[in-house]
Amino acid sequence: GFRDGSADRISHGF
């Protein structure tokens, strides 16, 4: 969500 902006929820851009 924050770093990358992919299929995440809070702060996981994976």
From Swiss-Prot:
One of its GO terms (cellular component) is extracellular region. One of its GO terms (biological process) is neuropeptide signaling pathway. InterPro entries: Tetradecapep (IPR012619). Pfam families: Tetradecapep (PF08187). GO terms for molecular function: neuropeptide hormone activity. The modification Phenylalanine amide is found at F14. Keywords: Amidation, Neuropeptide. Has a stimulative effect on the contraction of gut muscles. To insects allatotropin. This is Myoactive tetradecapeptide.
